[in-house]
Swiss-Prot record:
InterPro entries: MADS-box/MEF2_TF (IPR050142), MEF2-like_N (IPR033896), TF_Kbox (IPR002487), TF_MADSbox (IPR002100), TF_MADSbox_sf (IPR036879). May interact with MADS18. GO terms for cellular component: nucleus. GO terms for molecular function: DNA-binding transcription factor activity; DNA-binding transcription factor activity, RNA polymerase II-specific; protein dimerization activity; RNA polymerase II cis-regulatory region sequence-specific DNA binding. It holds the Pfam family K-box. This is MADS-box transcription factor 47. GO terms for biological process: brassinosteroid mediated signaling pathway; positive regulation of transcription by RNA polymerase II; regulation of transcription by RNA polymerase II. It comes from the Eukaryota. It comes from Oryza sativa subsp. japonica. Residues 1-20, 196-250 are annotated as: Disordered. Residues 11-20 have a biased composition (Basic and acidic residues). Its main location: nucleus. Residues 1-10 have a biased composition (Gly residues).
Amino acid sequence: MAGGGGGGGRGEGEGRAATGKRERIAIRRIDNLAARQVTFSKRRRGLFKKAEELSILCDAEVGLVVFSATGKLFQFASTSMEQIIDRYNSHSKTLQRAEPSQLDLQGEDSSTCARLKEELAETSLRLRQMRGEELHRLNVEQLQELEKSLESGLGSVLKTKSKKILDEIDGLERKRMQLIEENLRLKEQLQVSRMSRMEEMQPGPDSEIVYEEGQSSESVTNASYPRPPPDNDYSSDTSLRLGLSLFSSK
């Protein structure tokens, strides 16, 4: 039987190793008193350890109070249990004072939300009817009112459209006049520039016409028409007189 028990133990171990899954413990009251006390001691230490880690890692103020089944007190406080309890009491009083106003605000918010939802539904239905949808719900009078509303809205649309078109036409006309004025101004500037250039090119009445290499008209005229040579008779008479005077002196 021992061998059979050993074989059964190995078989159970092999089955656990094969599955590789850890059995989940059902969360319920432990009937065995000794097992319950052992579990309480282990879980309490683990709970206090987690609370301490939370206070250190997250810089949180943690207070933990546990009573065993026999009424024994166990507690953990990251700072001071009295300080934590005082802080808890003051926070609870603040919450109690704020609860009525918060409830009122929640009631007001609920009523406002309901009213807004109703208005949104009515407006959405009105828009669909103006687009020609869901008209079967309306009677003759409601259809006539809808027709008047559409005609009035269409008139406003046409009026606004006409005004915008006229404004665009006026703007284009102003731009056209500006372009015409700018064109005339440029033409005048071009004409003035041409006149001034022509005046610069024409010589003045008292200025001498300059020909090649700085020669004036007078020098060019003299070069073109040389003066006649002196009279030969006059020069011969002068030579005779000079010869006679020289002969007499000898």
